[in-house]
Amino acid sequence: MGLDLPNDNLIRGPLPEAHLDRLVDAVNARVDRGEPKVMLLTGASRGIGHATAKLFSEAGWRIISCARQPFDGERCPWEAGNDDHFQVDLGDHRMLPRAITEVKKRLAGAPLHALVNNAGVSPKTPTGDRMTSLTTSTDTWMRVFHLNLVAPILLAQGLFDELRAASGSIVNVTSIAGSRVHPFAGSAYATSKAALASLTRELAHDYAPHGIRVNAIAPGEIRTDMLSPDAEARVVASIPLRRVGTPDEVAKVIFFLCSDAASYVTGAEVPINGGQHL
C-alpha cells in the first residue's frame, strides 16, 4: 500500500510510565507465546536493505519494511513480506507522522525489537558525476537531508515507546563518505552521513537509560546498484583486502548489532570497508 496523504502532525512524546509497564507486560506475554522479534527496515527493496531483510527473515524475525518501490515477491520470498511492506517516500518529512502511524498499526501493540535506518539517496549530475558543494542546489540539499538524516530522527522519536518496551536496538547506516571526501559520493550525501554518525552518538547517549542501544555501520564500497562496474574497478586498488564488499557481509554486521551478542555495544560506528579507512 502507499501513503500518499501529507500529514504535518507533530511526533508525540514518550508514553507515561504506567502505559509503558503495560507494554512491557505485553512483551513478556508475547515472548512466552514464542512470537517472533520484529524489525522495521527502511529502504528494503534492494542492495543492503534487501540482504538485511533476507537474513533477518531466515533467522525467524518478522520484517516490517518500507520503501518508495512496491514489494517484489519474486526477489523477496520471505514470509508475509507483501503484507508487512508499505510504500512511502521518507524524503518527504510530511509523510513521517503517517508512516509512524502505519508502523504502529501493523505492530498492533507488539514491541519493536529493531529499527534499521537504511534508506538513503546519493544524487549525481546528469552525466553521473558527484555533486559538489558548489554545484548542489538547495532543493537537493534539503531532499538528501530529509531522507538521510531527518527520517531516522523522527522514526526513532515516534517509535520510542515500542523500542523501549523491547529493550530494542537502532542501527543507522552511515558511510565511509561521512569521514572523508569521496570520489563518487556527493557533498550533500557525505555531510548527511557525517551528521547521521553524530546523531547515532546523541541517540545512544539519550536512549541508553531507557534500555535502547543505538549504533551505526559505515559501509565502504559495496557491490550494489550505487556502484558501477567502472567505479568498482577504480577503487579496488585503494582497499587493503583488494575487493569490494557484498550486501550479505553488511547485513551480518547489522544482525550482530541487533542481537544479544551486542548487548553491551552502543554508540559505536562500525566500519565495513575492507580496511579502506586505514
Curated annotation (Swiss-Prot):
Keyword Ribosomal protein appears in the UniProt entry: no
Active site residues according to the UniProt entry: Y189
Molecular function GO terms recorded: oxidoreductase activity, acting on the CH-OH group of donors, NAD or NADP as acceptor
Pfam families: adh_short_C2
Signal peptide: none
UniProt cross-references to InterPro entries, sorted A to Z: NAD(P)-bd_dom_sf, Sc_DH/Rdtase_CS, SDR_fam
CDD domains for this protein: SDR_c (cd05233)
Annotated substrate binding sites: S175
Annotated S-S bridges: none
PROSITE patterns from the UniProt entry: ADH_SHORT
Keywords: Nitrogen fixation, Oxidoreductase
Gene Ontology terms: biological process: nitrogen fixation
Entry superkingdom: Bacteria
Annotated family: Belongs to the short-chain dehydrogenases/reductases (SDR) family.
Protein name, UniProt field: Protein FixR
Lineage of origin: Bacteria, Pseudomonadati, Pseudomonadota, Alphaproteobacteria, Hyphomicrobiales
Gene: fixR
